[in-house]
């Protein structure tokens, strides 16, 4: 009996009630691989698995698709070439801020730079553990440059992969928060949630059109039915005109904007070192890291109260028709010492409305001003007579006190505290506490004419001794402080600069303003010495004392070098032997001199300046200068030479040349054949 055609078999299977599927068509596609019936040898598993789905309902005589010439033989299709194994793609992970990390052998690398089609990567633990692991990617190829100094992060990597491989969740509500993995929230008193707004029912036709429109949106952007919509994000104004983001009783200050995303950092980042971050996109908030401190509930309530007061006054002025003076609302609140700004000191929170008299006076004053603003242009003389007395404004009749700084600037003195000038905006001058950098004090002050407004309280007592010293210096300006007749002494530095020598101390030049030259102590970075000096012609004035004794040995060595300059290496003809250079792993080059490695620092004319490779790791201060084939070393090394590393670099330098020779030999052989 002849076999039916494949189309007839499909029709019969459809008549029997079977649905056509992808598995039913596989035997037709894989007809190049045909098994022959053999009772002794079992059928291959791959062919049997392809045919069982389609031949389960067919009779046994239809199992043979093509005539078989030899039993027990599998006929394979001919292949013209061997299928090459495709290269494995690189694996990357996304960072919380939109970047990417390279995953290679359970190590994480962050991108450093890209040159052409090469991308250079360095270990993610480079800053924390000083790991020098490097990698270079070119297409799908990864080249490791150095070994890691720590084990691979297998547990954290598996956790990140599990987090990345989770199925996409339903659409988030507009006010909901997205909490990243590995982030635990700080326990704090939670604010009462707003009551959900009941949704208004829409007709069936509108719901139908709306459902059709929502089907065209991506799954993540479709609103989930039954989800409560929360209130929009809350923002508060800063005292300098910026905005704070309020989220779960924490305050965030704006950092940057990238596209539709706004990045925020915790306001306590500088004070407490808090590393919490937030990203807002529309009404959605994503918190990156947890806070290391509790929220300032009292301060937040004070800021909200201040915001409400500003809005009330603005509404009153708009209702009275004074649209031109709406920008001066905050100025009226800034009269006095603290106004509505809270103090973050010890004890309970106190606002600056403690006196009942000041309350009544401020109210009557705001009412009288709101009535007289419309007549402001015509009655300027009457307005000057209607101004309240200076007692109500907390204005010192003598004005604020200013003192000269040792370097020629100005200090603001208020309540025995010293403030340094920060910026000027219109008639307002903004000041910061002098001890901001040293003690982290966040106190600010604003001066406008004779008015002084303090923003935050100080975290330290006033420096009365330093204040009295500045006042005495102001009363008796010091021609006696200038050292006159002899004149200052100068010495050459090893790199061609100049040192100021005064009372056996060495000073490094900082800047020059007019005929004055400002100098800092040479040991400022090493010992934190804050001594300063100013030279004007032949006069020298020292500002602060040194915190260390003078370096007599170093001073004598500099004087000897000044008297007997070491120019033996530079005199005479150039040496015949060329300098040795080695390639770095990132494409630069090292200078090799007396088995030490130097990294290029700068070039000035024909001279090239080099510094020791181990400057950052070991603090070595050795320097070298090359001019042609001549080398001059400035300081000795504080460590022995790294002979093993030098030999490894030399072997790496020789390896590419050997590979090139092999390639040339192969090309020659092919040309001969």
Swiss-Prot record:
Stretches annotated zinc finger (FLYWCH-type): 92-150, 235-293, 402-460, 490-548, 581-639
Lineage: superkingdom: Eukaryota
GO terms for MF: DNA binding; transcription coactivator binding; transcription corepressor activity; zinc ion binding
Bias (Polar residues) ranges: 47-62
One Pfam match: FLYWCH_u
Zinc-finger as UniProt keyword: yes
Gene Ontology terms: biological process: DNA damage response; negative regulation of transcription by RNA polymerase II
Modified residues (Phosphoserine): 21, 294, 339
Crosslink feature (Glycyl lysine isopeptide (Lys-Gly) (interchain with G-Cter in SUMO2)) location: 110, 666
Cellular-component GO terms for this entry: cytosol; nuclear body; pericentric heterochromatin; transcription regulator complex
Record key words, sorted: Centromere, Chromosome, DNA-binding, Isopeptide bond, Metal-binding, Nucleus, Phosphoprotein, Repeat, Ubl conjugation, Zinc, Zinc-finger
Keyword Nucleus: yes
Biased composition (Basic and acidic residues): 147-158
Function: Transcription cofactor. Negatively regulates transcription activation by catenin beta-1 CTNNB1, perhaps acting by competing with TCF4 for CTNNB1 binding. May play a role in DNA-damage response signaling. Binds specifically to DNA sequences at peri-centromeric chromatin loci.
Oligomeric and partner information: Interacts with CTNNB1 (when unphosphorylated), perhaps preventing interaction of CTNNB1 with TCF4, and thereby regulating transcription activation; phosphorylation of CTNNB1 may inhibit the interaction.
Name the record gives this protein: FLYWCH-type zinc finger-containing protein 1
Organism: Mus musculus
């Amino acid at each position: 009996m002849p076999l039916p055609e494949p189309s007839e078999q499909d029709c019969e299977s459809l008549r029997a009630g079977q649905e056509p599927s992808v598995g039913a068509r596989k035997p037709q596609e894989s007809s190049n691989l045909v098994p022959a019936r053999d009772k002794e040898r079992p059928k291959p598993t791959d062919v049997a698995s392809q045919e069982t789905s389609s031949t389960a309902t067919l009779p046994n005589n239809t199992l043979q698709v093509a005539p078989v010439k030899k039993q027990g033989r599998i006929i394979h299709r001919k292949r013209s070439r061997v299928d090459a194994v495709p290269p494995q793609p690189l694996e990357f992970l996304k960072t919380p801020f939109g970047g990417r990390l390279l995953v290679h052998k359970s190590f994480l690398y962050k991108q450093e730079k890209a040159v052409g089609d090469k991308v250079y990567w360095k270990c993610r633990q480079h800053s924390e553990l000083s790991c020098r692991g490097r990698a270079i990617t070119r297409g799908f190829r990864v080249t490791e440059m150095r070994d890691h100094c720590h084990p691979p992060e297998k547990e954290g990597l598996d956790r990140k992969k599990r987090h990345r491989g989770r199925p996409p969740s339903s659409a988030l509500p507009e006010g909901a928060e997205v909490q990243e993995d590995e982030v635990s929230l700080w326990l704090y008193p939670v604010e009462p949630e707003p009551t959900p707004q009941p949704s208004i029912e829409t007709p069936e036709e509108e719901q139908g059109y709306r459902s059709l429109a929502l089907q065209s949106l991506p799954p993540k952007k479709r609103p989930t039915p039954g989800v409560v919509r929360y209130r929009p994000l809350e923002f508060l104004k800063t005292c300098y005109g910026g905005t704070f983001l309020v989220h779960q009783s924490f305050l965030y200050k704006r950092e940057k904007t990238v596209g539709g995303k706004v990045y925020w950092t915790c306001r306590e980042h500088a004070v407490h070192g808090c590393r919490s971050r937030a990203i807002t996109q529309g009404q959605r908030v994503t918190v990156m890291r947890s806070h290391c401190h509790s929220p300032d509930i009292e301060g937040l309530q004070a800021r909200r109260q201040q915001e409400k007061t500003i809005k009330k006054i603005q509404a009153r002025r708009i209702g009275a028709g004074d649209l031109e003076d709406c920008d001066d609302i905050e100025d009226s609140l800034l009269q006095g010492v603290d106004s509505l700004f809270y103090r973050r000191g010890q004890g309970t929170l106190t606002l600056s409305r403690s006196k009942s008299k000041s309350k009544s006076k401020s109210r009557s004053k705001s009412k009288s001003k709101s009535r007289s603003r419309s007549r402001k242009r015509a009655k300027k003389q009457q307005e000057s007579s209607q101004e309240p007395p200076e007692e109500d404004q907390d204005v010192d009749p003598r004005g604020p006190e200013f003192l000269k700084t040792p370097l020629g600037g100005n200090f603001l003195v208020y309540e025995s505290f010293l403030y340094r000038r920060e910026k000027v905006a219109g008639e307002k001058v903004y000041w910061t506490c002098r001890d901001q950098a040293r003690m982290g004090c966040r106190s600010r002050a604003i001066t406008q004419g004779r008015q002084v407004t303090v923003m935050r309280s100080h975290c330290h007592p006033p420096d009365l001794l330093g204040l009295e010293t500045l006042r005495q210096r102001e009363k008796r300006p010091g021609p006696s402080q200038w050292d006159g007749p002899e004149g200052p002494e100068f010495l050459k530095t090893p790199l061609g600069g100049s040192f100021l020598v005064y009372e056996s101390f060495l000073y490094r030049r900082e800047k020059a303003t007019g005929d004055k030259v400002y100098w800092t102590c040479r040991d400022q970075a090493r010992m934190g010495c804050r001594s300063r000096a100013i030279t004007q012609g032949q006069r020298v004035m020292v500002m602060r004392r040194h915190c260390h004794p003078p370096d007599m040995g170093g001073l004598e060595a500099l004087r000897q070098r000044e008297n007997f300059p070491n120019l033996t290496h530079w005199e005479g003809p150039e040496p015949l032997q060329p300098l040795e250079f080695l390639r770095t792993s990132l494409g630069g080059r090292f200078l090799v001199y007396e088995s030490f490695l130097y990294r290029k620092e700068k070039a000035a004319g024909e001279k090239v300046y080099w510094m020791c490779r181990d400057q950052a790791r070991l603090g070595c201060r050795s320097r070298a200068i090359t001019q042609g084939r001549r080398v001059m070393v400035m300081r000795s090394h504080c460590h022995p030479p790294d002979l093993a590393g030098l030999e490894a670099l030399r072997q790496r330098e020789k390896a590419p040349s050997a590979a090139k020779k092999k390639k040339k030999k192969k090309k020659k052989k092919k040309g001969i054949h």
